[in-house]
């Protein structure tokens, strides 16, 4: 949604078995297309940015197929141990395929920042690139999903703007900006080579 707000043509391809992104997109107006993987070939033709929402899986063929042609794969990772372990497993597979990837810490409870710091240290200790910021755990994200809007537009039960929504929006803006910087650096490096 950050890139759509910046004027890019964005398409989210829902490759997750539970079709959560498609359901989210059907609830409201997100400002970008959300399509099931079966419709991706046609729907992504005019997109400048294609985001694939896939299921967390360490199945090699599935990861290879979903990440083929990607400029970068972002691995959303909660600070919980199993999520960190799964990200490390997926990273090893992606590294074996030579696919650029980075972890993004999500659902970070600011009251328990120590767990996020430990997760970051563990991921970096295994050689993973971890995006600088993290996405906070906020009720505004749940409200936005129910309403079918971006977190920036989330409102409470009385129709008032959720007071913490901009904290979530700012976190996604920072992650999007860092991803753009990474891709620009990669592009410049490829041109120089």
Regions found by a protein language model. Name each.
Residues 119-155:
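Beta-strand-loop-alpha "switch" segments that mediate conformational coupling across diverse proteins
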Residues 1-68, 145-156:
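P-loop/Walker-type NTP enzyme "switch/lid" segment
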Residues 143-173:
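Inter-lobe coupling/hinge region of RecA-like P-loop helicase motors
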Residues 69-88, 109-112:
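Conserved Switch II/interswitch segment of TRAFAC-class P-loop GTPases
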Residues 84-110:
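Conserved C-terminal guanine-recognition region of P-loop GTPase G domains, centered on the G4
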Residues 78, 101-117, 133-145:
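G-domain G4 guanine-recognition motif of GTPases
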Residues 9-10, 50, 73, 100-102, ...:
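Hydrophobic anchor at the start of a short beta-strand
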């Amino acid at each position: 949604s950050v890139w759509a707000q910046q004027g890019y043509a964005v398409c989210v391809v829902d490759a997750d078995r539970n079709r959560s992104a498609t359901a989210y997109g059907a609830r409201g107006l997100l400002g970008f297309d959300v399509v099931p993987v079966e419709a991706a070939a046609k729907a992504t033709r005019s997109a400048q940015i294609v985001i694939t929402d896939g299921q967390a899986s360490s199945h090699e063929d599935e990861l290879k197929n979903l990440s083929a042609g990607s400029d970068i794969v972002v691995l959303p990772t909660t600070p919980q141990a199993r999520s960190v372990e799964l990200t490390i497993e997926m990273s090893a597979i992606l590294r074996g395929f030579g696919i650029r990837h980075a972890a993004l810490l999500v659902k970070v409870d600011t009251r328990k920042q120590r767990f996020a710091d430990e997760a970051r240290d563990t991921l970096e200790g295994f050689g993973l690139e971890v995006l600088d910021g993290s996405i906070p755990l906020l009720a505004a994200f749940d409200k936005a999903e129910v309403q079918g809007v971006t977190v920036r537009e989330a409102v409470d039960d009385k129709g008032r703007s959720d007071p913490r929504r901009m904290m979530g929006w700012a976190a996604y803006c920072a992650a999007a900006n860092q991803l753009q910087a990474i891709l620009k650096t990669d592009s410049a490096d490829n041109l120089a080579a």
